[in-house]
Amino acid sequence: MKIWTVLLISLTPSYLLAQNNLGPRLTALGSNGAAVTDIWSLQANPAGIILVTKATVSLNYTKHLFSDEISTQALVAVLPFKNNYVGASFQRYGFAEYSESKVGFAYSKTFGKKLSFGLNGNYHQLKITNYGSSTGFSVDVGALYKLNKNFTFGGFISNPTKQKFNSSEISAQISTSFNVGVSYYPSDKVLIATAVSKVLNQSVNVSLGLDYRIVDLLSLRGGLSTSPFKQYAGFGLDFRNFILDMATTYDANLGYAPQIALGYAF
């Protein structure tokens, strides 16, 4: 075990404990998932999966460059039927001596052409060498409202009941957050998204992102967030049924965290 890595995690948990992996597209938009529709909304606002028109799966890998050992792997899948949508997600973060895993199952439903609601149930597992493991459960609830072709408003709450890991050996809180946002489409090619998020016991975070579709095949993205200050950039390729997204996050304290996701719509 590398002692410095364990000490780093214990001393700076707000930076190193796993956050929901939003996939490269939402990450490149400033980790902006409150009012943006995407398959990776399963990891943010579950109501945001409503524009997935075909059974779709996406696999993601993130490398945290401040340590050669730490990485994140994630998988999401969505199956639409009529005005109902079901989804499943998996995420693992960590290294050999420390890991966090989460499995989620979501259900979303549209009501007319403007309103949708989503619910996501999560099973969490935390493992620390020499300390054992612990499990916990949480839920995410969210909603989207499409005002018109230009504006969409959204919001979601993660773990509103403040659930914790249930082991006496490991005392850890599953984070609770409140998130609201708006997406603005000035044209068919441009998306501007912003969100305000509050994780309990942390500062309010404001994020802003831009998605510009240059051609049908290629989109360029960028974003910012304030707490802590981070910069984001990425691109997406959409070719036939394949979807390739890449993004990187820059944090002044932790450096770069590039990620890639490959998806397929059946």
Q: Which sequence ranges carry the predicted segments?
A:
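Sec-dependent N-terminal signal peptides
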Residues: 3-13
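Subset of outer-membrane beta-barrel
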Residues: 17-266
